[in-house]
Amino acid sequence: GWCERVPEADEVLPAPLPPYRVLTGLVDRFGRTQTFHREAAGEFSGEITGVTDGAGRHFRLVLTTQAQRAEEARQQAISGGTEPSAFPDTLPGYTEYGRDNGIRLSAVWLTHDPEYPENLPAAPLVRYGWTPRGELAAVYDRSNTQVRSFTYDDKYRGRMVAHRHTGRPEIRYRYDSDGRVTEQLNPAGLSYTYQYEKDRITITDSLDRREVLHTAGEGGLKRVVKKEHADGSVTQSQFDAV
């Protein structure tokens, strides 16, 4: 091959990599690959809409906009003879979690399988339902059975207060005024409480067993450097500058 352009005489070579690059694939240590295919144009331009794995299978990722989901909700209400619920056509462009363009993954289809090219499933492998606020509400498997459900705080968008696996009890969460989880409540198993101090978090389960997480750093660089287990053992961790 050849260079796409001739570098200037005073350029430092090799040129530094750009700070942001487009992810095109993954390869693990066993050589297994995933190749990502991005939409070239249109409302989903630049978004990943296809994946090819190392076995040559191709998966299509169906994306939807907030406006499309709102229209679908209205049509479902009309066909069901019910009053349409409040489902806005747009979402806030920026939230405390970052920029939100309203695009969500709605389904994943297997569209090519070299081993069974004539035996592709007639339904998506998985389907996702979303709330009017753009939060993940439900997950459905290939038989269209709901396998996961999620509930969110009415006041704080994106704050999950409960979730459930089909056939299991609902797990609920309580938060403090800073948005930190203080309780995880399981009616059929272990529940947990969380107590926060400056550089430590104490976790106590419903059998009164306690673990303590010791942290170091600030903000997004805070890391768990020591964990005191309920049996008295201790695990310590070290991190490099990167």
Model-derived segments and spans:
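Extended charged/polar low-complexity repeat regions
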Residues: 1-242
